[in-house]
Design a protein with these regions (language model features):
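Beta-strand-turn-beta hairpins that frame and shape the catalytic cleft
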Residues: 1, 14-20, 101-110, 162-168
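Active-site-proximal loop/helix segments of hydrolase catalytic cores
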Residues: 144-208
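Active-site environment of divalent metal-dependent phosphoester hydrolases
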Residues: 29, 52-57, 80-83, 100-102, ...
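Catalytic phosphate/metal-binding cores of nucleic-acid and nucleotide-processing enzymes, i.e., regions
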Residues: 3, 49, 53, 74-75, ...
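Pre-active-site segment of Zn-dependent metallo-hydrolases
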Residues: 12-53, 57-65, 69-71, 118-147, ...
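Active-site neighborhood of phospho(di)ester-bond hydrolases with catalytic His/Asp-centered motifs
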Residues: 21-25, 43-52, 74-77, 169-173, ...
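Metallo-beta-lactamase
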Residues: 77-157, 163-164, 238-245
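Binuclear metal-ion centers of metallo-dependent hydrolases, dominated by the metallo-beta-lactamase
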Residues: 70-73, 84-101, 183, 204, ...
Length: 248
């Protein structure tokens, strides 16, 4: 099994002869991990966790009949509705909901209910009145225009991949439903480390509930300035070593 982080929440998982791409996104001007659409277009199976632009905006390119991509896209109903407003042919868009199982050869992907993180008001104000906001003002205008077109709509999914005798949990945002029971002990949890004013505390709550064997952090990079920012992960690593030394 091979897992590659491609910036933001984009993850490519290769196992049992299958390749699955989660949440592809091309970073904006000034992004910390510059990439391009060609980095993704060879992928044939796309899983989307939710409808926000940094998870869904590039997906129409995979559905363009004039491109070389002929991908199948799995996503929730809200994200599917967004795609239907953007492309003429959505025959390759498969709506999924919690409890569904996606089967790709010997790979099995369980769809689970997630929850989107809630940024604090102080975080928003800090970004609006920062020098960075002026530096990337064109990005800010583009994001202000695009953001309403990509609603999350209260629907964030989480995926658990079963392949090669391993379980990998892929979260698209740092949140779990309070009344939901989740499988524990995954071989790897891909944890988006962004989006909360109390980031370490919220992440530790997720770890406590899921009890993974290993963790891979993503989404902590500055992908769409001035709205995003680079998040220092060292404090979280220190807390993990203290509270969960068995988790690597």
């Amino acid at each position: 099994m091979k897992i590659t982080w491609l910036g933001t929440a984009a993850i490519r998982l290769e196992a049992d002869g299958e390749t699955v791409l989660f949440d592809p996104f091309v970073q904006l001007v000034g992004g910390e991990n510059p990439n391009c659409l060609d980095d993704f277009l060879q992928d044939q199976t796309i899983c989307v966790t939710h409808g926000h632009l940094d998870h869904l905006m590039e997906v129409p390119e995979f559905l363009d009949p004039e491109s070389d991509a002929e991908a199948t896209v799995y996503c929730g109903e809200v994200a599917a509705e967004t795609l239907s407003d953007m492309v003429e042919n959505t025959s390759n868009v498969v709506k999924v909901r919690p409890g569904d199982v996606i089967r790709l050869g010997d790979v099995r992907i369980l769809v689970m209910e997630g929850k989107h993180a809630k940024p604090g008001k102080s975080q928003v104000f800090q970004k609006l009145f920062s020098r960075k906001f002026l530096q990337y003002f064109r990005n800010a205008l583009a994001l202000a225009y695009l953001n309403p077109k990509f609603p999350e709509g209260g629907q964030t999914l989480m995926y658990e991949v079963h392949a090669e005798g391993k379980r990998v949990q892929v979260m698209g945002s740092l949140g779990l439903q309070e009344d939901q029971e989740y499988p524990q002990g995954a071989d790897l949890l891909i944890l988006p480390f962004q989006g909360s004013e109390f980031l370490e505390a919220v992440a530790l709550e997720v770890v406590e509930r899921l009890q993974p064997k290993r963790i891979l952090l993503d989404h902590f990079d500055d992908a769409f300035p001035p709205v995003s920012e680079h998040v220092d992960t060292r404090r979280f690593k220190k807390l993990m070593d203290e509270e969960y030394p068995q988790i690597k």
